[in-house]
């Protein structure tokens, strides 16, 4: 159109654990016109590093939003107003970690802004969001650089206090190196350090407990449209084992993914 490309999208996602636990939900549903996008969509916080080790967002990274993005090719900038209507999730570090403070009910509002650029073999973006109900915000930077046989990724995140966008820790640094071993095989070792993981009743970060994690993600293209992914991660949380999420643990998954 004279206002730019017009696009509508509806995505459905189904899950079946057993005969009595199954269902299909709307994954995304939005309209785009030029740089304007409105509807139910993933936020920019969903776009973290490519591997499966990092924890760079909190709570639900999807909801109703009104977004505008200006894209000049090697540079882009965007602003988004988001409805923060989902409940508060458990910590992504460990479900045993008790989050202090509290969130109010649904229909809260958040504001996000992002800028990004590409400089030769390097791409980078800086994302900032503010939770108007919690009166706290978070900033996250991600940089990718093509180095040798793979791509190096580095990210840092900081939060002023507990908020909908990021409340896993007061700050964190994550790095990965995605090695393109063959046309079909990519191996991505990664590590992350999270500083000050506890939240006080006033929603401020408190204490001196930290956590770190390391792992590897393996992606293999079996054939056109069929991929396999295997991820294994090790994590260590400060404190007395078994108390408030402290101790070490191993996690992982195996996934077959069909694309059309």
How does the language model describe each region?
Residues 5-6, 34-38, 74-79, 119-126, ...:
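Repeated loop/turn-to-beta-strand initiation elements of outer-membrane beta-barrel proteins
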Residues 220-222, 246-260:
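Outer-membrane beta-barrel "beta-signal"
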Residues 27-29, 34, 62-66, 75, ...:
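Hydrophobic, lipid-facing positions within transmembrane beta-strands of outer-membrane proteins
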Residues 13-19, 43-54, 82-104, 122, ...:
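Sequence/structural signature of outer-membrane beta-barrel proteins
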Residues 1, 12-14, 72, 81-83, ...:
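Short beta-strand segments enriched in hydrophobic/aromatic residues
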Residues 1-88, 112-123:
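Outer membrane beta-barrel
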């Amino acid at each position: 159109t004279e206002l730019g490309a017009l696009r509508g999208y509806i995505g459905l996602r189904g899950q079946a654990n057993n005969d009595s636990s199954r269902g299909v939900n709307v994954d995304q549903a939005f309209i785009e016109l030029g740089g304007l996008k409105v509807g139910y969509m993933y936020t920019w916080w969903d776009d973290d590093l490519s591997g499966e080790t990092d924890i760079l967002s909190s709570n639900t990274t999807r909801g109703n939003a009104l977004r505008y993005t200006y894209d000049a090719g090697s540079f882009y900038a965007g602003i988004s107003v988001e409805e923060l209507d989902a409940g508060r999730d458990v910590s992504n570090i460990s479900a045993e970690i008790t989050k202090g403070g509290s969130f109010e009910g649904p229909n809260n509002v958040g504001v996000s802004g992002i800028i990004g650029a590409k400089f030769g073999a390097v791409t980078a973006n800086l994302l900032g969001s503010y939770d108007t109900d919690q009166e706290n915000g978070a900033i996250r930077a991600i940089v990718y650089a093509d180095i040798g046989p793979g791509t190096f990724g580095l990210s840092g995140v900081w939060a002023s206090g507990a908020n909908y966008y990021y409340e896993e820790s007061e700050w964190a640094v994550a790095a990965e190196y995605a090695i393109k071993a063959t046309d079909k095989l990519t191996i991505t070792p990664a590590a992350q350090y999270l500083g000050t993981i506890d939240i006080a009743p006033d929603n401020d970060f408190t204490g001196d407990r930290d956590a770190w994690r390391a792992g590897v993600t393996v992606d293999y293209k079996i054939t056109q449209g069929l991929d396999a992914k295997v991820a294994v991660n090790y994590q260590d949380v400060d404190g007395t084992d078994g108390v408030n999420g402290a101790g070490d643990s191993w996690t992982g998954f195996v996934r077959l993914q069909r694309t059309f």
